C-alpha cells in the first residue's frame, strides 16, 4: 500500500494551487477596477465577487463532499482542475459584473472540490494525528501564495492582469488534476495504533452521519464560532493591497507582506495544529483567537505608523487566523468521528461563505462610505474575541449524543 504520507503531500500540492485563487486575489482587485472604470466599477463591486467565490465553494461543499465518502477523491480532483482553469482563466476577459461573478463562482466550486478532498485525506488517513495532518493540508492552501504572489505581481505588471488570469488558470488546473491521481480513501476497517492517540484530546467513539450531526446543538455552536473568527482574516486577505494603499505603505513593503503573510498563514496551521494535539483544541483556539482580536485592533493605529509595523502586524494577523482551518475540522472529527468527515466538515465549512461576504463586500462598502478601514478591523476584532470566549465553553459542553442514546448532563473537562 502506498505510504499515507505520499497521499497527504499530493493533496498538499492541490491545496497550494487552489490557495492562489484566494490569496492572490488582492493583487487583481484594483487593476480590474481600473480596467473597467468606463463601466463605473468600484472596489466594493469586485470585492463582492471575492465573497461570492468563497460562498459558492463553501455552500456547495456538502453536495461535493458526499461523493468523496462514496466514490473517492479522484473524480472530484479532475472536476476541480477543469472548473478552476475555466473559471479563473476567464476572469480577465469578462465584460460585465454578472459574468465576472458567475466565472469566479465556478472557480470557487472547483476550489471546494480540492479542499474537501484534502481535508478528507488528512482526517481519514491520520486519525491518530488529526491536528498536524490537517495543519499540513490546510497550510498548503494558506502558504502556497508566498511563492506565487511575487510571480503573480510581476506577471500583472508585464503581461497584464488578463493574460495572467488565463495562463495561471491553465497551469493550476493541470497541476490539480495530476495531484489527484494518487488520492484514494483508506480501506474499510483502516485503523491506527490506539497508543498513538493523545490523552489531552476528547474523542467520540461513534461515527455520526451529517443528518445525525445536524440534529445536535454542538454543531451550531461550532458553526457560529467559526463564522465569527473567519471574518477578520478573510477581510485582510481580500483587502490587503487596498488597505496598504490607504495606509500609504510603500510598494516594497507591500511585496514583502505578500510573501510573509501567506507563510504566516500556512505556518499557523501547522504550529497550532501541533500544539492542539498536546494542549487540547479548546485552549489552543482561545489563545489564538484572543491574539487575533488584539492584532486586528492594533492594525488600525500602529499599522499606519510605518512600513515595518504594517508588515509585522499583517503577519501576526495571519499567524493567529489560519489555524481555524485546522482546529475546526480536527475538533469536528473529535466530536463526530472520522468515517463521514468529508461530508460533515463541508457543512461546518459553509460558515466561511457567510464570513467572506462580511469580510469582502461589506468591508469594502464600509470603507467607501466612511473613508476608513477602522470599522471593519474593529468589528472583526470584536467577533474574534467572542469566538475566543466561545472556545472556553466548548471545553465544558458534553460530546454530542445520537438521538437513541441517553444525553449526559455533565461531561468531564479535558485539557
PLM-predicted stretches and their roles:
Residues 141-188:
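Helix-loop-helix hairpin linking two adjacent transmembrane segments in secondary transporters
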